[in-house]
Each structure stands twice: as C-alpha cells, then as structure tokens.
Amino acid sequence: MTERPKDIPEDKLVLYVVKATPTSTANTVKPLIVMNELSIDHEIYVVPSPTRDEWFHQINPHKMVPAIESAETRDGKRLNIWESTSCLTYLTDAYDHEGLWKGSDLWERTQVNNWLTLHTAALGATGKYWLYFSAIHPEKIPAVIEKLANNIKVQYDILERRLSEKGQKYIALPDRPTIADVANLPFVTEELALKAGLRLGDWPNLQAWSEKMLARPSVQKALSQKFRPSVMIR
C-alpha cells in the first residue's frame, strides 16, 4: 500500500503496532506501558506490513514498530518518533511534567539515561536477536543461540548487582520505576529466562523486581494477553 490510510486519526497521538494487538512485539509494549502510566490519550493503529507499506516508511525509515505519530505539526508535517527508546524519551519529555518517569533533576535524568542506554546497547539488542535466532530464524544455529543466551546471563548479572545495592528497589532510581525499568522488563521474565535455559530465581533481586513490575496495573493492561516473548518480535 502506497497511500496513507484515511482512517488514521489526524488529531491525536498514534502508536503504530503490528498484528492484532498492541503487544505484538516486546518493544511495542514499552511505550504502551508509559502511555498507561501517564494516562496519555492515544490511538493504536495496526500496520498490516511495515516493511511493504510505503506510507509507513515516511513515519519510520527503518520500517519497524513501534513508531509514534504526534498530533503536533511544524511546517505542515507531523512529528514522528521511532525506535522504542526514542518513543519512551519522547513520551516522558512531552507528558511527564513532574519527572517521575524520566528523572526530576540532572542527577536523576543521568541515572535514567545511563541505564536506558545500557539496555538499548546490551540486553535489548541481545534479547531481540536471541528471540529471533531461537524462535524465528529458519535455521537453528546452536553456537549463536548459546552465545546470545550467555550474553543475557551477563546482563542479568549486571542488573542483579544493581538491585543488590542498599535501598535500590528499581534499576535507575532507588525509590520508583522509570523508563529504564520499562525498557528492561520485556526481556526479564521467568518465561524468557526459561527459554534461554536460565532460571530467573538465580537472580533473586532481579526476579523480585520483575514480579513487582509485572504486577503494575499499567503493565497488566498493556500486556492484555499471556506474555509470550517468542511471538513478541518481528
């Protein structure tokens, strides 16, 4: 499809997803959690084929979800936000006026950005490719799958040490969750760990954190279905 569908709202924020639910990908659920936490009015639009629908390439040149289209315009063009980390930072910059989720001062924002950037470069990338090679790639390559699973273990070790620090209840800030926690959550679940041949209980602080995050109403609402990492990636 080359033309932009006429049923896409022009007057509100739009979150673009694939398949039939907002939780089609591990990365798509992240901005949805923040939208729920901040009570952001939004529309969810299911893109039939992000790689083939040419109109969507104007929103995200990488041809992937999640992507967000803001109602804000400049010179007649709407503001496009793509890649999950960019979506998280945009949503908190635009709607988190008290800095609860992005950090309220330079110290807190730096902590959040440190852990958010680490996730983007490490566990996020590793988890994504592990899911791809273990569940989607037509040819199973044991050495690659094992290497990626071991890398997940390394990242779990880092998060466990962080959560073992005195008073550290969450990843970036000690007293409350932030977008750094939201970013990591889809890749730190009992189900994903088991699929990687790991036991999340071997990282007790990380397991407790995961269970606490998964119990949040915003997360429950965003998931809206059984958490299945193997089908949450394209």
Swiss-Prot record:
E.C. code: 2.5.1.18
Gene3D superfamilies: 1.20.1050.130
GST N-terminal domain segment(s): 15-99
InterPro entries to which the protein is assigned, alphabetical: Glutathione-S-Trfase_C-like, Glutathione-S-Trfase_C_sf, Glutathione_S-Trfase, Glutathione_S-Trfase_N, GST_C, Thioredoxin-like_sf
GO molecular function terms attached to this record: glutathione transferase activity
EC primary class: transferase
Family as reported in the entry's similarity comment: Belongs to the GST superfamily.
Protein name, UniProt field: Glutathione S-transferase sirG
Species whose genome carries this gene: Leptosphaeria maculans
